Amino acid sequence: MRESISDLMTVMIPLLIILLLSNYSKSVDLEFYLDTPELIKSWGYSVEIYNTTTKDGFILELHRIPYGREVPTSSDVNNSRPVIFLQHGFLCSSFDWVANSPHQSAGFVFADAGFDVWLGNFRGNTYSRKHVSLNPDKDPKFWDWSWDQISEYDLPAMIGKALEISGQESLYYTGFSLGTLTMFAKLSTDPKFSRKIKKYFALAPIGSIKHAHGVFLFLGRHFGKDYEEYVKKHGSDELFGSSLLFKKIVKYTCGLFDTLEEFCSDITLLFIGTANENWNQTRIPVYLAHTPAGSSSNVMAHLDQMFSYGGVPTFDMGEEKNLKAYGQKLPPQYNFTGIADVPIYLFWSDDDWLSTKQDLEETLFAQLNSQVVQGSFRIENYNHLHFIWGTNAASQVYNVITGIILQDDNT
């Protein structure tokens, strides 16, 4: 009898769990399952996909929203429109710019304003996990790069493709987080590149991260050095690549009950700052279905070095490799004082735990020429991700950028 009851329980408990999951799980938004091009189409916008190859062989995928949701007229097609290039941050993708409803998402807001919108994807993420000869699943060399190479190779390849297809000579660049750091580095090391950038809008701009708060501060202090040594010893590898398993975990945790959804939101906020009424907790399952989108462990090690050393050092590969690459034992520092000829607009917040005011004061505010910085916008009560996912980011950030571009384009 006891054996029969035990057998019955063995069958019934899994069935009860399945029934509970099916009856009480919340419906997940459609965008949970869609990739970026599919998501753009689902909102009624046109989308185009392009590939570009970097000088070191990485194949990067670009997503273009050529027009707004309204059907373009023949004059719209024939007339040149402002080209705006949007570049995501660390472990992110082109999804970030279309993550919310059209009136809240930068990609859609700019398209509806009449701009030719391009969304970039850095090497190693969901959409740019390709190379002319290296296999990301078999060749460790595929992952042997830091954000130095992203700045040196990815930005010119992607922006060059956008200019080639659009027929323009220069464009408006909007970067978020790592998308700002890499552009600052590019402009400081390649002054001629400034000819391709009409204006540069930096959201949650990164100079140094020595004074970061939250979980990143804890991890950097207690595990940063060990992580750097591990990467130096064992080599770089894929870091937090997107996977079907992770999506399922997100769906059946963050997307299951309101309490778990709130828990997932709280975990996210430990890294970036506090929430407010402009933080859409109900979208967390969708955000986490697309983020993290993958990168190289060398990039994380490089960020750890920035936290440890201060300033903006190039990647420290160890004395022997540093001597070969840089001609000196220690990695040289980037210097932003020489950036010229590109009007820069900074959008930042005192409440951002990754792009802190103290770090901005010690790097970007201190080094950038005052004539180059034509706007510095302090946004109240914004954490790091509010700049791309905040429900009022359109009014606080994107509409400001739109006004600046339209005024510039009409002069």
UniProtKB/Swiss-Prot annotation:
Q: Which GO terms describe its cellular component?
A: cytoplasm; lysosomal lumen; lysosome
A GO BP entry: positive regulation of autophagy
Q: Where would you say this protein principally sits, based on its record?
A: other
* Catalytic residues identified in the record: S177, D352, H384
Which UniProt keywords are listed? Glycoprotein, Hydrolase, Lipid degradation, Lipid metabolism, Lysosome, Signal
GO MF annotation terms: triacylglycerol lipase activity
- Keyword Signal assigned to the entry: answer is yes
According to the UniProt record heading this chain, what is the dependence of activity on pH?
A: Optimum pH is acidic.
Q: Which Gene3D superfamilies match?
A: alpha/beta hydrolase
Q: Which residues are glycosylated?
A: N51, N78, N280, N335
Signal peptide interval: 1-27
Q: Which reaction does it catalyse?
A: a triacylglycerol + H2O = a diacylglycerol + a fatty acid + H(+); 1,2,3-tri-(9Z-octadecenoyl)-glycerol + H2O = di-(9Z)-octadecenoylglycerol + (9Z)-octadecenoate + H(+)
Enzyme Commission numbers on file: 3.1.1.-, 3.1.1.3
Explain what induces or represses this protein's expression: Up-regulated in the intestine by fasting.
Q: Does this entry carry the keyword Coiled coil?
A: no
The family classification in the record reads: Belongs to the AB hydrolase superfamily. Lipase family.
Question: What is the protein named?
Answer: Lipase lipl-4
Q: Lineage, please?
A: Eukaryota, Metazoa, Ecdysozoa, Nematoda, Chromadorea
